[in-house]
A protein has these predicted regions:
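Asp-based, Mg2+/Mn2+-dependent phosphohydrolase catalytic module
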Residues: 2, 6-10, 16-132
Length: 132
């Protein structure tokens, strides 16, 4: 995952974590896993006053990131909170990370794409970076 985050940084793509965990827990996790310098912003449900899939956490992330254009990617593992929330609330392209204990969303929770390894997503990002 760190290689993917390095690629995003080199391409100048802003990144944010949008989480339902409390700020204290999320900040500790990010530091523990050595990811603190990879993300530009962390938005918690505590800050937003609502849990995902409410639009507030997503909107706060967009306000902080101020992305160029209207191409937003939401990468998450929860079909309802991340995938449907990202698509319905901020019109994001949705990418679902599949790992043990998760299933690909169906119906209104279906992602635009699903992946199991971050290297798969990294190859896609690099191809898109070559085109841009």
């Amino acid at each position: 995952m760190k290689e993917l985050l390095d690629d995003l940084r080199l391409l100048g793509i802003p990144t944010a974590i949008v989480t339902d965990l409390t700020a204290q827990i999320q900040f500790r996790k990010v530091v523990y896993f050595g990811l603190d310098h990879y993300f530009d912003y962390i938005v918690t449900s505590e800050e937003a006053g609502y849990d995902k899939p409410h639009e507030a956490p997503f909107q706060i992330a967009l306000e902080k990131m101020r992305p160029k254009g209207n191409c937003i990617w939401m990468i998450g593992d929860n079909p309802v909170n991340d995938i449907r929330g990202g698509r319905d609330k901020i019109n994001a392209i949705t990418l679902q990370k599949i790992h043990e204990g998760t299933v690909v969303g169906t119906g209104e929770n279906i992602p635009d794409a699903a992946f199991t390894e971050f290297n798969d997503l990294r190859r896609l990002v690099n191809r898109l970076g070559d085109v841009a």
